[in-house]
From Swiss-Prot:
GO terms for molecular function: rRNA binding; structural constituent of ribosome. InterPro entries: Ribosomal_uS11, Ribosomal_uS11_bac-type, Ribosomal_uS11_CS, Ribosomal_uS11_sf. GO terms for biological process: translation. This is Small ribosomal subunit protein uS11. HAMAP family: Ribosomal_uS11 (MF_01310). It comes from Herpetosiphon aurantiacus (strain ATCC 23779 / DSM 785 / 114-95). The lineage of its organism: Bacteria, Bacillati, Chloroflexota, Chloroflexia, Herpetosiphonales. Residues 12-21 have a biased composition (Basic residues). Residues 1-11 have a biased composition (Low complexity). The gene is rpsK. Pfam families: Ribosomal_S11.
């Protein structure tokens, strides 16, 4: 009797569900280029995330994450995942002051995605919060 209860307790329903493949022919690529990292998120036109990648997830650590090369590798990875989901056409939205802005957009174009628009959506304050103090090196 005790053995049966143990065997039943060991059998749990599967937690992680298998990721379904979406067929999305056109979408949006959001490139967030900060001073420390670059994150590329590819969504469908409604804004639902299809796939994403970041310089940290691409294997870069520390100060190497903020390089243009890391942004290029990240954008290529995200574009490959998106093309596996059937994406062909993207609009690119670039946000942030980071070094990987242009290289990420170029990498998206080079992997075979058709870029129809590039928009800069960097938030600019109308004299809001005080910026961080200047670095003294």
């Amino acid at each position: 009797m005790a053995k049966q209860a143990k065997a039943g307790a060991a059998r749990r329903p599967q937690r992680g569900r298998r990721r379904e493949r979406k067929n999305v022919p056109r979408g949006q690529a959001h490139v967030q280029a900060t001073f420390n990292n670059t994150i590329v998120t590819i969504t469908d036109p409604a804004g639902n995330v299809v796939c994403w990648s970041s310089a940290g997830a691409s294997g870069f650590k520390g100060s190497r994450k903020s390089t243009p090369y890391a942004a290029q590798v990240t954008a290529e990875q995200a574009a490959r995942k998106a093309m596996d989901n059937g994406m062909r056409v993207v609009e690119v939205y670039v946000k942030g002051p980071g070094a990987g802005r242009e290289s990420a957009v170029r990498a998206l174009q080079a992997t075979g995605l058709s870029v129809i628009a590039i928009t800069d959506v960097t938030p600019i304050p109308h004299n809001g919060c005080r910026p961080p103090k200047r670095r003294r090196v």
